[in-house]
Curated annotation (Swiss-Prot):
Pfam families: OSCP (PF00213)
HAMAP family xrefs: ATP_synth_delta_bact (MF_01416)
Primary location group: membrane
UniProt subcellular location: Cell inner membrane
Lineage: Bacteria, Pseudomonadati, Myxococcota, Myxococcia, Myxococcales
Claim: Magnesium is one of the keywords in the record: no
Name of this chain's protein: ATP synthase subunit delta
GO molecular function per UniProt: proton-transporting ATP synthase activity, rotational mechanism
Oligomeric form and interacting partners: F-type ATPases have 2 components, F(1) - the catalytic core - and F(0) - the membrane proton channel. F(1) has five subunits: alpha(3), beta(3), gamma(1), delta(1), epsilon(1). F(0) has three main subunits: a(1), b(2) and c(10-14). The alpha and beta chains form an alternating ring which encloses part of the gamma chain. F(1) is attached to F(0) by a central stalk formed by the gamma and epsilon chains, while a peripheral stalk is formed by the delta and b chains.
The family this protein is said to belong to: Belongs to the ATPase delta chain family.
Superkingdom per UniProt: Bacteria
Organism from which the protein derives: Anaeromyxobacter sp. (strain Fw109-5)
PANTHER family assigned: ATP SYNTHASE DELTA CHAIN
Length: 179
């Protein structure tokens, strides 16, 4: 709970600045890249979140990271602030909250679409179009593959789930036959 409120506070502050400067989308993308980079490197995560490392050591790494990702000054300053306050461990939650605020601001929703096999571009676009009609918003797909579905897709938009998987259809048929 505390982590969520702290992350929300930082994300809202940065988001307000992004709106003011008209940089919501670029900052959202660069923050997501930053998050993926940090999460993808256990060593980097260790250095950034472990208070054993001095402030100067963390700051030097953050400077190199910001330069490598070509972060604009405000997102980079967020990193420095988090480092100075030993809160770099909150980065993932801050980025997720910022991304949610950005999506809401830009009138879009994210849908998690799970399929039995990888979706090609046209199938993914068709699903996104149908979900856009249902939600009256632009839909961005986060795709996953789960062979256990056997066929079809499961789409989740917020708390709403559309389950068109073969696995669920077979389970429904099995239940009906048992009655």
């Amino acid at each position: 709970m505390i982590m969520g409120s702290i992350a929300r506070r930082y994300a809202k502050a940065l988001f307000s600045l992004a709106v003011e400067k008209g940089r919501v989308e670029p900052w959202s993308e660069s923050l997501q890249s930053l998050k993926e980079g940090v999460e993808g490197s256990p060593d980097l995560r260790e250095v950034l979140s472990n208070p054993v490392y001095s402030r100067e050591q963390r700051r030097a790494i953050v400077e190199k990271l910001a330069a490598a990702l070509r972060l604009e000054s405000e997102p980079a300053n967020l990193l420095f602030l988090l480092g100075d306050r030993n809160r770099l461990g909150y980065l993932g939650a801050i980025v997720d909250t910022f991304r949610a605020l950005a999506d809401e601001h830009l009138g879009r929703v994210r849908a998690k679409v799970t399929s039995a096999v990888p979706l090609d571009g046209s199938a993914a676009q068709a699903i996104a179009d149908r979900l856009s009609q249902a939600t009256q918003a632009t839909v961005l797909l986060d795709r996953e593959v789960d062979p256990a579905l056997l066929g079809g897709v499961v789409a989740q938009v917020g708390s709403l789930v559309y389950d068109g998987s073969l696995r669920t259809q077979l389970e429904d048929l099995r239940r009906q036959l048992k009655q």
